[in-house]
């Protein structure tokens, strides 16, 4: 059994899938299974994956139930001990899965970890380097708009 599940939720995101899945195919750590949860898309998303990435486990929902339900559905269907939630419009570095897996394994008490998100439009800027929460539970993106070099 693989050690990691990568769960990708989708709704009519065909235009993003080649970039996302090509990056996953280049991972240095290969002990992962990809689960693709489709929220009733009307585009060619599932057909594209069946043709180009047939190893992907496709979970087709009959309607657009939204981000959370799709992620929860994929997480429940996975059998791997660790789960990475990944957006369909994401392009990851080749060591993405490896670094998250190694990071979570180093901390016995950790229940979650997060990747550094770099802006797609401005590749030298941080989109999110972890979140801060205030007393009311509002989340704030750490490092938003700051140089990537500050978060190495």
Language model segments and positions:
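Acidic helix N-cap motif at the loop->helix transition within catalytic regions
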Residues: 43-51, 95
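Conserved short acidic donor-positioning loop in nucleotide-sugar-dependent glycosyltransferases
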Residues: 24, 39-44, 65
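Glycine-rich, basic loop-to-helix element that forms the pyrophosphate-binding segment
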Residues: 61-78, 88
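Short aromatic/hydrophobic "clamp" motif used to bind/position activated sugar donors
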Residues: 83
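Short beta-strand/loop segment that forms part of the nucleotide-sugar
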Residues: 31-40, 59-61
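Cell-envelope/extracellular polymer assembly enzymes that use nucleotide-activated donors
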Residues: 2-5, 33
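Conserved donor NDP-sugar-binding/catalytic core segment of glycosyltransferases
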Residues: 93-127, 131-134
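Short, acidic, metal-binding catalytic loop of nucleotide-sugar glycosyltransferases
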Residues: 22-31
């Amino acid at each position: 059994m693989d050690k990691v599940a990568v769960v990708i939720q989708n709704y009519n995101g065909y235009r993003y899938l080649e970039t996302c899945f090509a990056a996953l195919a280049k991972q240095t750590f290969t002990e992962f299974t990809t689960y693709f949860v489709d929220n009733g898309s009307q585009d060619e998303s599932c057909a594209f994956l069946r043709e180009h990435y047939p190893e992907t486990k496709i979970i087709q929902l009959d309607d657009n139930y939204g981000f959370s339900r799709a992620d929860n559905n994929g997480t429940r269907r996975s059998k791997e001990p660790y789960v990475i939630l990944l957006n369909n419009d994401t392009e990851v570095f080749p060591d993405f899965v490896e670094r998250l897996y190694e990071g979570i394994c180093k901390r016995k008490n950790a229940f979650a970890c997060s990747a550094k998100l770099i802006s797609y439009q401005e590749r030298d800027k941080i989109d999110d380097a972890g979140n801060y929460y205030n007393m009311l539970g509002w989340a704030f993106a750490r490092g938003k708009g700051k140089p990537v070099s500050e978060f190495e």
